[in-house]
Regions:
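Positively charged, low-complexity intrinsically disordered leader regions
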Residues: 1-56, 60
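Active-site cofactor/substrate anionic-group-binding motifs, chiefly glycine-
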Residues: 42-43, 47-98
């Protein structure tokens, strides 16, 4: 499993691959082509504090890429009952394709 926490964790080759993919995706949008790179993928979004812009940007991005985003607030999860965010994320990672904290 590859975690993307910061750019410094990536090799130069991985950074170039990300930039190439971003350029391809941008070109698809410009040309009006279908670009469902995340079709069938589900992202769990864990929020300890509400963030409207972050939630909307991730939900919109997942939708545009053909995937689904699930919003999980602290009060709707074990986080609201004192469980560490890392434990909740570990359990959720067994059922989801990606987790955004």
């Amino acid at each position: 499993m590859k975690h993307f926490l910061k750019l410094l964790d990536c090799t130069t080759e991985e950074i170039y691959e990300l930039l190439d993919l971003a350029a391809t995706m941008k070109q698809y949008v410009k040309e009006g082509k279908e670009h469902h790179f995340l079709k069938g993928k589900t992202l769990g979004m864990i929020f300890e504090k509400s963030s409207t812009r972050t939630r909307i940007s991730f939900e919109t991005g997942m939708y545009q890429l053909g995937g689904h985003a699930l919003f999980i607030s602290a009060k709707d999860s074990q986080i609201g009952r004192g469980e560490p965010t890392q434990d909740t994320a570990r359990v959720m990672s067994r059922m989801l394709d990606g987790i955004m904290i």
